[in-house]
Each structure stands twice: as C-alpha cells, then as structure tokens.
Amino acid sequence: MKKLFGTDGVRGVANIHPMTTETAMQLGRAAAYIFKSSSRRRHRIVIGKDTRLSGYMLESALVAGICSMGVDVLLVGPLPTPGIANITKSMRADAGVVISASHNPFQDNGIKFFSGDGFKLPDEIELKMEKLLDSKKIEALRPTATEVGKAFRIDDAAGRYIVFLKNSFPPELDLAGLKIVLDCGNGAAYKVAPAVFEELGAEVIPLGVKPNGTNINAGCGSLHPEVISEAVKQHRADIGIALDGDADRVIVCDEFGNEVNGDQIMAICATDMIARKQLKKKTLVATVMSNMGLDIALRKVGGKIIKTAVGDRYVVEEMRKGGYNLGGEQSGHLIFLDNNTTGDGVLAALQLLAVMRRREKPLSELAEVMIPLPQVLVNVRVRERQDIMTIPPVAVAIKGVEEKLGNEGRVLIRYSGTEPLLRIMLEGQDKYEITGWANEIADLVRQQIGEK
C-alpha cells in the first residue's frame, strides 16, 4: 500500500514532511537506483519545476540524491509538466521529475515522476520507490570518484517545447486575426504559452505572467475563470484561456465570457474528430466526474464514452490499454495521445482553436454541441477517511437521494487524492433541488467526520 504517493505523486506543504529536502533527496536516490539499468552508458534524469519559491530547495535536494547514485541530471528550469514529459522523451533520458503542486497554493509543493517514454509511473514502480527510501540496499551501491553524477542545465528547453507545441497545430491553419486573453496563473507556462499563440499569429492579452515565487495560482489561472471572463468582455476577445500552475490543465471561456470546461472542450474536439474520422474506435475516455451531458453529446454523433476513476493517470492508462487517442477530465486535464503523453493545457487549447478555425465558428456556437445537466459539487474538509457508506445516517441520506433521482441524475461521492476533502457531486434536472440534497449530505458528513 502506497503511503507517500497520492494520485499525482508526493505532495504536501513545503518543508513539512513529506515535502522536505530529506525526502526529496531520498526520492532522488531511489529513482536513480530504479532507472539505472545494467548497461554501461551514463544515465540521465530530467528535472523541471514550476515557479514556487520552494522549488529551488527541492530541486537541489533531488539533484544531490540522483547524482549520489551515479546518474546525471538535466535541469530544464520552470517548464510546464507536459513540457518536462516531452523533453524527457525527446532527450532519451531514463526518467523525468516534476517539482510542482499543480493548482495548489504556493506554500504546497509536490514531486512526480515520468518514465523515459514520457508517461507517469505505474503504481507498482511508485511502491517500489517508496520501499527503497529507507533501504540499506542503496547504501552499499554508492559510486565514488568519476562514477558520481553531475548536473547540466538545458538552456533551450523552453524553445524546444515551443517548437513542439507549434508543430501540433495543423500547418494549413494559423491564428491570425484572433484576439486571445491568456492567463498563465503566474505558473510554469508564463514564458512558453504567450510565445506559442503569438508566433501562430494571434493577438495575445497576457495575464498571470509575472511569477514571484508566491503568487502562483493566487486569484488567477484555471481555478479562477472569472478573471479571463471579465478580461474577454473588456477586450472584446474571441476566447479566454486559463492554465493552472503547471499548465497540465486548461479552462476556456467563449467570446461572451461564458466558461467552457473540460467536458465541453472534449465534446467539441471529439465530435470534430469523429467527423474527420480521427477519433480512434469513436471512443472518448473520461472520468466518473464528467457530466452526463457529455455521454449524450457523444451518442448523438455515433460515439461512445468510457469512464475511469478520477485522475488523469487513470485516463491515460485506459487510453493506452484500449488504443484510444482522446481523453480527459472535467477539470481541464485533456490528453491528445497522438501528440503528447500527458495532459497538456496549451496543446489542448491549440486543438480547440484548430476546430474554431476549421469550422469558422465562434466558440459559443461550438459549445452548443453539449448541454450539461445541472451539476453541484460540495467539498467537505474531513479529519479521517472513513468509508462513507459505513456511516448509517450518511448512507441512508445518499440512498434516499439516489431513489429520488432515478435515471434522471446521479450521486458521486469520493475522497480527494491530494487533500483531506470529501467531494460530494450530484447531477440532475433541477439545480435548486440537487443543491439542497448535496448540502444535506454535506452537513451529515461534517457532523460525523468533519474537520474539528
């Protein structure tokens, strides 16, 4: 059972266990040990980060751990998570490490790993890494003299990723004449994203491009779509694009400032790909959090949807297993597997813009392909993770709501993979009604296991 790794690597408040320099160094050593094959060549691991203040100390600790095991390090500096995955693959490195807590506030940080092919590590390798942290096995294998590793800085990493992103956009199209509001959330994409859209011909109004180490995701980025919504109306832009701290997710808004979430972007792109015979097996992979409106939209055009557990890694695993090429989450993690190995906010925005260009339609019109069912999400902070159906009053309330909804909606209750939260999600035809039911369940949960 993994204790350290959550659904997206190791995460926590920087400088408090487990997100300490000591743990980072041990993780570096364990990763180097695992990825070092028996061949005699030099081994290399890529390390990138977002713009958090604590990224510097964790980066240094990881470098020390990796080099102490005789593996070299390639430092790419602040770069989107998908960019680090891409460079890990293109530079033929043995693994990649991302120092980021994604959409969390600046005081948090995280460490996650990619294997040499650019995909996130499977659970069993994370478990192996965890077991090695306190193992004496590593101690006996420390190299000396010329065998220790060294660190190199890759100065053109951002430029390489910009070229990769531009090459993912159809060569017969451009963005000339489009006005784009772009909010980088003071995160990892602050240099890369504006350059990509500008070089493809768009007029870019950049927001959240002045990181100072403490302002990442602070009232900006994909968790605050109201920022791009207001700016789009103010500047009369064609689209607003908001990225999170490590730019692996994207939320957009149309020319009227209305939010278009991950489900709607998937509906637009999937229906376009079906029309062009590009969607493999006419199948989209989404998670259980996706709105039922997405299922309906896909069925209308002869497509189907497969649902996985929450977490983009599970979406990618299902896509690879079934040979599918489009998947994602409502939160804006969108995976175009023909182009990249993980969720990529900038790449997803480019694919959406390509549909707008190809169809010569505004985003508001394209978004009509999906009519979302009213959905309510209530988060409750909890002191313990108890199976919710073993708490009698909560279980009775949930079953009662499910009976009332019948086939016209659903109840989904799950714990967050990264925070002490229970997420209560209801879907149904009447928003007022389901909001009341969601709050009733939330109140019962607070009484039983809520944070004191």
Swiss-Prot record:
<keyword id="KW-0597">Phosphoprotein</keyword>
<keyword id="KW-0413">Isomerase</keyword>
<keyword id="KW-0479">Metal-binding</keyword>
<feature type="binding site">
    <location>
        <position position="244"/>
    </location>
    <ligand>
        <name>Mg(2+)</name>
    </ligand>
</feature>
<feature type="binding site" description="via phosphate group">
    <location>
        <position position="102"/>
    </location>
    <ligand>
        <name>Mg(2+)</name>
    </ligand>
</feature>
<dbReference type="GO" id="GO:0005829">
    <property type="term" value="C:cytosol"/>
</dbReference>
<dbReference type="GO" id="GO:0005975">
    <property type="term" value="P:carbohydrate metabolic process"/>
</dbReference>
<dbReference type="GO" id="GO:0008966">
    <property type="term" value="F:phosphoglucosamine mutase activity"/>
</dbReference>
<protein>
    <recommendedName>
        <fullName>Phosphoglucosamine mutase</fullName>
        <ecNumber>5.4.2.10</ecNumber>
    </recommendedName>
</protein>
<dbReference type="Pfam" id="PF02878">
    <property type="entry name" value="PGM_PMM_I"/>
</dbReference>
<comment type="function">
    <text>Catalyzes the conversion of glucosamine-6-phosphate to glucosamine-1-phosphate.</text>
</comment>
<dbReference type="InterPro" id="IPR050060">
    <property type="entry name" value="Phosphoglucosamine_mutase"/>
</dbReference>
<dbReference type="GO" id="GO:0009252">
    <property type="term" value="P:peptidoglycan biosynthetic process"/>
</dbReference>
<dbReference type="InterPro" id="IPR006352">
    <property type="entry name" value="GlmM_bact"/>
</dbReference>
<dbReference type="InterPro" id="IPR016066">
    <property type="entry name" value="A-D-PHexomutase_CS"/>
</dbReference>
<feature type="active site" description="Phosphoserine intermediate">
    <location>
        <position position="102"/>
    </location>
</feature>
<feature type="binding site">
    <location>
        <position position="248"/>
    </location>
    <ligand>
        <name>Mg(2+)</name>
    </ligand>
</feature>
<dbReference type="InterPro" id="IPR016055">
    <property type="entry name" value="A-D-PHexomutase_a/b/a-I/II/III"/>
</dbReference>
<dbReference type="InterPro" id="IPR005841">
    <property type="entry name" value="Alpha-D-phosphohexomutase_SF"/>
</dbReference>
<dbReference type="GO" id="GO:0006048">
    <property type="term" value="P:UDP-N-acetylglucosamine biosynthetic process"/>
</dbReference>
<dbReference type="InterPro" id="IPR005846">
    <property type="entry name" value="A-D-PHexomutase_a/b/a-III"/>
</dbReference>
<dbReference type="Pfam" id="PF00408">
    <property type="entry name" value="PGM_PMM_IV"/>
</dbReference>
<feature type="modified residue" description="Phosphoserine">
    <location>
        <position position="102"/>
    </location>
</feature>
<feature type="binding site">
    <location>
        <position position="246"/>
    </location>
    <ligand>
        <name>Mg(2+)</name>
    </ligand>
</feature>
<dbReference type="Pfam" id="PF02879">
    <property type="entry name" value="PGM_PMM_II"/>
</dbReference>
<dbReference type="InterPro" id="IPR036900">
    <property type="entry name" value="A-D-PHexomutase_C_sf"/>
</dbReference>
<dbReference type="InterPro" id="IPR005843">
    <property type="entry name" value="A-D-PHexomutase_C"/>
</dbReference>
<keyword id="KW-0460">Magnesium</keyword>
<dbReference type="InterPro" id="IPR005844">
    <property type="entry name" value="A-D-PHexomutase_a/b/a-I"/>
</dbReference>
<dbReference type="Pfam" id="PF02880">
    <property type="entry name" value="PGM_PMM_III"/>
</dbReference>
<dbReference type="InterPro" id="IPR005845">
    <property type="entry name" value="A-D-PHexomutase_a/b/a-II"/>
</dbReference>
<comment type="similarity">
    <text>Belongs to the phosphohexose mutase family.</text>
</comment>
<dbReference type="GO" id="GO:0000287">
    <property type="term" value="F:magnesium ion binding"/>
</dbReference>
<dbReference type="GO" id="GO:0004615">
    <property type="term" value="F:phosphomannomutase activity"/>
</dbReference>
